[in-house]
Amino acid sequence: GVFTHESQETSVIAPARLFKALFLDSDNLIQKVLPQAIKSTEIIEGNGGP
C-alpha cells in the first residue's frame, strides 16, 4: 500500500534554513534531537547534489 500525508505549517525560520536543516543536514540533526535513540548515521548512496 501507499501512505500519503500532507501538512502545512508556519514557522519563523526562513524556508531555506528549514529545508537545509530538515533535508540536507538531517543526518546531523537527528542525532542531536534523539541522541538516546540514534547512535550514528551514515549516507550510503548519493552526495546530496544533482
Swiss-Prot record:
- So which domain of life are we looking at? Eukaryota
Q: What InterPro entries does the record tag this protein with?
A: Bet_v_I_allergen (IPR024949), Plant_def-hormone_signal (IPR050279), START-like_dom_sf (IPR023393)
Q: GO MF annotations for this entry?
A: abscisic acid binding; protein phosphatase inhibitor activity; signaling receptor activity
Q: Which UniProt keywords apply?
A: Allergen, Pathogenesis-related protein, Plant defense
Q: Name one GO biological process term.
A: defense response
Cellular component, GO annotation? cytoplasm; nucleus
Q: Which family does it belong to?
A: Belongs to the BetVI family.
- The protein's name is Major pollen allergen Que a 1
